[in-house]
A protein has these predicted regions:
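A helix-centric hydrophobic-segment signal that preferentially recognizes long
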Residues: 2-198
Length: 198
């Protein structure tokens, strides 16, 4: 009887070792860590915006509409609670991504409009903020890429047999992923014309 129990325990241990639970835990933590980095970089960008807005406000005839768009987009982006659970809710993730995309677009328009204001372009404080913003945008891209990779690794794992059975038993589901904005437009190759066609 003791031999039977020993064999049963050994069999159970080997089955549990091969079920992938520990690997699911590891990949899940990697996704959470990568997500925390994404949030940290988005927060860094959000923290820079008030300084940029105040610097730009100093330019008396600056286009207020563009500035208002940036302020409103920042308010919308920071109103969405970016919790670790957000990656488990595709609809919430889509809302978060849309708000961050709108903020990126508003900032891009602001930087384009700034080109029309030589005094602002020459302002060292603004140039420093602009450099910090560009660096932050690069960090956001790196953090998003790491998150995409971690999420992809996790999602592949929880769909593979026999780990998918363990994932199902313990309630692990695929995680929401960042999507490409304007996916159809990105897939279509651009038409390049150097003025040679007549």
């Amino acid at each position: 009887m003791t031999l039977f129990r020993t064999l049963l325990v050994a069999l159970a241990a080997s089955v549990l070792a091969g079920c992938g639970y520990n690997e699911i835990q590891s990949k899940d933590e990697a996704v959470k860590g990568a997500w925390a980095e994404v949030i940290s970089q988005y927060q860094r960008r959000a923290d820079l915006i008030p300084n940029i807005v105040e610097t730009v406000k100093g330019e008396a005839d600056f286009e207020r509409g563009t500035l208002t768009q940036v302020i409103e987009a920042r308010a919308k982006a920071t109103s969405i609670q970016a919790t670790p659970e957000l990656v488990n809710d595709p609809a919430a993730m889509a809302r978060f991504q849309q708000a961050q995309g709108e903020l990126s677009s508003a900032l891009s328009r602001l930087m384009a409009v700034v080109e029309n204001y030589p005094n602002l372009k020459a302002n060292q404080g603004f140039q420093d903020l602009r450099t910090q913003l560009e660096g932050t945008e690069n960090r956001i891209t790196v953090a998003r890429n790491r998150f995409i990779k971690a999420t992809q690794d996790y999602n592949v794992l929880v769909r593979q047999f026999p780990v998918n059975l363990t994932a199902m038993v313990f309630g692990y589901k695929q995680k929401a992923q960042f999507t490409v904005e304007n996916e159809a437009a990105v897939q279509k190759a651009p038409t390049v014309d150097f003025g040679t066609k007549k």
